[in-house]
Amino acid sequence: MGIVKRENIGFDIRLLTIEEDENYDKAKQRVIIGRTDDFLDEHKTIMYYPFAGSIDTRIKMWVRSTNWRLVSSYYGKKDKAQKAAIVEAFKEGDKRMIIATKAFGMGIDISDIDRVYHVAPSSTFVDYIQEIGRAARDKSIKGIAATDFHERDFYFMKRLHSAGAIT
């Protein structure tokens, strides 16, 4: 593997705090909803989520209904025309956030993505580097790679490794 140096990508890694009246899932939802509200400004964000089957349901949970028009999902089982339309809408700024599996990766070249947020850890370090590399391809942009981390997040990594693939 070669050396990759991207000085225009910073990191925003926060420890997920579980409040007294919450469990892990409620705390994660609370934090993601807050992050989603923050991210739906004039910037472009990719939010990586590891499981394709529930992305569309998660959008309804994480994004206020008044902002649904600004968000799309992207995963392997969408057909080629849908994927192309989503990429074009994101590129043009009609969509400000894509909630995606790692299928939103290779071949996607959008230079003005500001933020990449990981709901859970990527399945491998190489995947993580590739995913955060979507941010700030335009060297004049300061990109942010963000996550809210909890030790329970490793559960997702273990599931991904045991499944052998992400769609």
Summary of predicted features, one role per range:
Residues 26-30, 34-104, 108-167:
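C-terminal helicase lobe
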